[in-house]
Amino acid sequence: MNLFVALFINASLSFILISVAFWLPQLNIYTEKASPYECGFDPLSSARLPFSMKFFLVAITFLLFDLEIALLLPLPWAIQITKLSAMMITSFILISILALGLIYEWMNKGLEWTE
């Protein structure tokens, strides 16, 4: 019975909060609130501006390195396993790949912004 009451209270409170969050912003609609903020320039102008290829390459490089680091995040919890040497070898391989990728990008001047 207590579980049913708790579930009912949680569901009703959630429904009330969601409905208030949905209906409250619609009471006061302003043009500043309705338009997106785009760092000081007019967001309603043409979106077909030239895109810097250097920025794209740096962004892709960041994503690749970020994914490799995300592979290293569970390794502190892997210390609790019995095969510590396998975890150390895996982490060394991942860090080596990360370092080799950084060296490759650095040698090919992929990290230099101005040219």
From Swiss-Prot:
GO MF assignments: NADH dehydrogenase (ubiquinone) activity
Q: Name one Pfam family in it.
A: Oxidored_q4
Segments passing through the bilayer: 3-23, 55-75, 84-104
Q: Is Transport among this UniProt entry's keywords? A: yes
Q: Does the keyword Magnesium apply?
A: no
What GO CC terms are in its UniProt record? mitochondrial inner membrane; NADH dehydrogenase complex
Which Enzyme Commission numbers does its entry carry?
A: 7.1.1.2
Q: What class of enzyme is it?
A: translocase
Q: What is its main location?
A: mitochondrion
Catalyses which reaction?
a ubiquinone + NADH + 5 H(+)(in) = a ubiquinol + NAD(+) + 4 H(+)(out)
Which UniProt keywords are given for this protein, alphabetically ordered?
Electron transport, Membrane, Mitochondrion, Mitochondrion inner membrane, NAD, Respiratory chain, Translocase, Transmembrane, Transmembrane helix, Transport, Ubiquinone
Summary of the function given for this chain in its UniProt record: Core subunit of the mitochondrial membrane respiratory chain NADH dehydrogenase (Complex I) which catalyzes electron transfer from NADH through the respiratory chain, using ubiquinone as an electron acceptor. Essential for the catalytic activity of complex I.
Give the multimer and partner information: Core subunit of respiratory chain NADH dehydrogenase (Complex I) which is composed of 45 different subunits. Interacts with TMEM186. Interacts with TMEM242.
Name of the protein described by the UniProt record: NADH-ubiquinone oxidoreductase chain 3
* Protein species of origin: Sigmodon hispidus
